[in-house]
Each structure stands twice: as structure tokens, then as C-alpha cells.
Amino acid sequence: MSRLRLAALYAGGFLGPFGGAMTSSVLPEVGADFGVSAGAAASTLTGYMLPFSLLMLVSGTLGGRWGAVRAVRLAYVAYAVASVLCAVSWSLPALLAGRALQGAANAFTTPLLLAAVAAVAPRERLGRSLGLFASMQAAGQTFAPLLGGVAAEVSWRWAFAGATAVAAALALIGLPAAVPRGGQRPPLRSAWRPRTLRLAAAGFVAWGCLGGVSFLVALRLGDSFGLGAGQRGLVLTGFGLVAIVTARLTGWLVDRVGARWCARVGAVVGGLLLAGAGVLPSVVVVGALWAAAGAFSQAVVVGLNALVLSTEEGNPGGAVSVVQSLRFLGAALSPLAFVPLYHLDPLTAFLVPAALALTVPAALLHPTGARPGTTPVTR
């Protein structure tokens, strides 16, 4: 297997989350360029996430029909074209069009790359391989605001120029030869089996109540401790940094003790940590608890991905696509659910998602009996 293509497979995990978050730190600059407010410029985040999360309901299955290698290459080309449009955009609507195309392209790369990781990884090392991919995704999410801000010292458009170059390079390199080339035509409904939907629902609740509630922590850091924007950002970064560092360890645990166990424990402990971050009176403790939650959120992500990819034979890309779609939809809807609750009672706003994370994923992931072909990874 080409080492370059294998490296490109994991690098693709960085590009998607990086593209989604690259404008988060440069909203004032984007708004100033187009004569709109920073709030209006924030639509560049929604404009990416909506097509990304909604298209993933079907993109994995469609990509499987066309062949993962071909579909991922075309998606990278589309991503590069979209990034060029963003870099040269002459108005906010033009930028939003480019962002929407970026999100649509990433809706194909994310699930198909995950399925490709499962295809090339030895069965006994699936968790570790998915952990490495998850660490790259966490790195993209964590460093996108920093790199976008650095680019904005010259012009925010340079961030999109860099994304163009990376996407074009990944399109040229392609995927490892072991990745399936297509030939099957799985029906869309094959990705919507009851077991997959249970995993997707667990991801919806767990990620919406853990990875998707950084805004709650930011609000508390400002209201309870008086931290400024830069200080709040530094504390919040701890979640992503710990997720990067611990993802490989999480993958090792998946291989040793089982994906189901890791996902359930990750959600339960993550819920407890979130409750502590909403209750305890020390800013240092809150920061430490939030950083630790990054590790346990990765246990949920890697565990769910391993569960679906280790047992789904006919349409793994479609199944993991549905799980990922619901995961990101949970994060997108989290502010709508919990910000109004925070304004009513900050403590309740932390305890409600903490309670949901403690109970719902564990119930949905409760073993329903042995399945044919069950392996240690699926325990």
C-alpha cells in the first residue's frame, strides 16, 4: 500500500472539519469586507453545516454506488472549486454559495473516508485506525480558528487559498488501492436499518450534549468568572487538544475492551464532567473538566464509528454516513435547545444535557443479544 495514499486518507479527516470552522475566528473581517455585521457573516458557518449534515443522510450510499475512490476524488475537486469561489467571492451570497458547495463536497468525503479506513485497517486494529482518523478530525476542528485568524492578518481569503491547494493535492493522490472501487448498488434504505438508527440516535444525543455545548461553557466562563473572549477561547481549546492527544488511546481501548463499552462509558463520564463544569465554582476546575470531556467525547465518536463499520457488510459507507449526519445535526440544534434554557437558569442548562448524556446513549447502546459474527470490537 502506498504510504503517501495512506497518509492522504488520514489527511482528508483534517480537511473537512477545518473547512467547517475556518471562518469562525474571522467573522468581523468577513463582515467588514462585504459591508455586513459579524452576525450576518456567521451565516457562513450555517451555510456550510446545513448541506453537510443533511446530505450525509444519503451521501455515503450514493458514494458507495459510484465507487469510493471515484466519489472521493470528485468530492475533493468540488471542494477545491468551492474554495476558489470563496477566495474570490465578490459578495456575501457568493461566499455562501461557495461555503454550501464546500459542505456538500465534505458530506461525501467524511463517510467514505471512514469506510475506507475500515477497508484498509486490519480487523484487530480497527479501533486504533479510527482513533487516528478521529484525532485528525479533532485537529482540523481545533486549529481552524487559529489558522484562519493567522491568514486574516493578511486576508481571510488566504485561508481558502490554502484549502484549495490541499484539496487539489488530495484529489491527485487518491485513496489506497485496497479501497473498494464500486460495483455494488446498495439501496438507500439499506443505510436506515433499526440498528443503525439506534447508533445514530445515540450519536445525536451524545454529541449534541457534549461536543455541541461549548457555547454553554463559554457563557459560564464570561458570566460567572468574567473571562474575556481570548481567555474563553483558550479554555475551550482544551477540549480539542485533549481529544487530539487521547484519540489513539481511545482507539486502543476500543480494540481491547469493545466499542460499545467505550461509547457508553464515554457518554456517561462526559455527562458527569459537564455537570461539574456547570456547578463547581473554580474556573481552573471548570477548564480541567471541560478538557477531560474532550477525551470522553472521542470515546463516543470512535466507539460509534467502530460499531457501525465493524458489523455493516453491505453498505458501510451509507450506514456510517447516517450516524455522522445525526451526530452533526445534534451539535447544530444544541444552541437552539439550550441557549434559551441558559437564560432562564444557567444551572439547569448544564444539568439537562448532562442528564441526557448520562442516560439516553447508554440505553440506546444496551446490548440486545449476540449477533452472528460479533467480534471483541463490537462488545
Where are these regions (language model features)?
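Conserved MFS/SLC helix-loop-helix module at the cytosolic interface between two early adjacent transmembrane helices
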Residues: 53-90, 254
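A late C-terminal transmembrane helix in Major Facilitator Superfamily
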Residues: 314-344
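Helix-breaking motifs and short loop linkers at transmembrane-helix boundaries and internal kinks
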Residues: 35, 67, 88-94, 226, ...
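C-terminal membrane-cytosol helix-exit motif in multi-pass small-molecule transporters
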Residues: 164-183, 361-368
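Paired small-residue
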Residues: 82, 93-102, 284-292
